[in-house]
């Protein structure tokens, strides 16, 4: 059932996937559902809802990624990082979170599903100093764009971008982008079976 739904959703967003990638995405939902019962990793309890609200909500960003090295800040159980890593095996993803149970889950997913292009790091973002900066800084965890830019300003490479995943856009928030940053692009995203608004903001350092 989930496999057929995933097939339809991927076709709807025009994202090609191999049989192995589809299996990894479905198995990720299965592991998230299983671990969630014990570790409370997400408030979404139903696998079909997870497929929409976690997998597809992450994958609609995939075709907009530019570069090779990405960091997913406040990734939780690996969202959007793990689905994006599955669909972009040529890119590297660092998954950053401060809670050990989330990092343990991510590492188990990586091991069981054979995802070799992610590395999970347990750290607060302000304490994390990467040896190499990133082409893209992703997050759907921050309440405000201002918070994301304030906490993550040290992470992008010289020509790197911030990818802020937001729901409905707040005009006031857009007007209070911190100095030194500029919104390069606002992209409206359409997630299959989801009525709520979704936006991707690409932000650069000036």
From Swiss-Prot:
Predominant location: cytoplasm
Localization (cell): Cytoplasm
GO CC aspect terms: cytosol
InterPro entries: rRNA_ssu_MeTfrase_G, SAM-dependent_MTases_sf
UniProt-listed CDD domains: AdoMet_MTases (cd02440)
Entry EC no(s): 2.1.1.170
Binding site for S-adenosyl-L-methionine: 74, 79, 125-126, 140
One Pfam family it belongs to: GidB
Catalytic activity: guanosine(527) in 16S rRNA + S-adenosyl-L-methionine = N(7)-methylguanosine(527) in 16S rRNA + S-adenosyl-L-homocysteine
Signal peptide feature range: none
Keyword terms, alphabetized: Cytoplasm, Methyltransferase, rRNA processing, S-adenosyl-L-methionine, Transferase
GO molecular function, a single term: rRNA (guanine-N7-)-methyltransferase activity
Role played: Specifically methylates the N7 position of guanine in position 527 of 16S rRNA.
Similarity section: Belongs to the methyltransferase superfamily. RNA methyltransferase RsmG family.
Protein name, as recorded: Ribosomal RNA small subunit methyltransferase G
Primary gene name: rsmG
């Amino acid at each position: 059932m989930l496999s057929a739904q995933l097939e339809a959703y991927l076709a709807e967003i025009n994202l090609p996937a191999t049989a192995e990638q589809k299996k990894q995405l479905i198995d990720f939902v299965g592991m998230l559902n299983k671990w969630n019962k014990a570790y409370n990793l997400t408030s979404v309890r139903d696998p079909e809802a997870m497929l929409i609200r976690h997998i597809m909500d992450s994958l609609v960003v995939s075709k907009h990624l530019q570069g090779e090295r990405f960091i997913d800040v406040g990734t939780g159980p690996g969202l959007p990082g793990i689905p994006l890593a599955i669909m972009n095996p040529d890119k590297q993803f660092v998954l950053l979170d401060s809670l050990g149970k989330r990092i343990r889950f991510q590492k188990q997913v990586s091991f069981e599903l054979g995802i070799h292009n992610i590395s999970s790091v347990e750290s607060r973002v302000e304490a994390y100093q990467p040896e190499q900066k990133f082409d893209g800084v992703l997050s759907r965890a921050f309440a405000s764009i201002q918070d994301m830019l304030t906490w993550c300003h040290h992470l992008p490479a010289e020509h790197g971008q911030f990818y802020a995943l937001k729901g409905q856009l707040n005009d006031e928030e857009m007007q209070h982008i911190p100095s030194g940053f500029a919104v390069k692009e606002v992209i409206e995203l359409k997630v299959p079976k989801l009525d709520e608004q979704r936006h991707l903001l690409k932000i650069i350092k000036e």
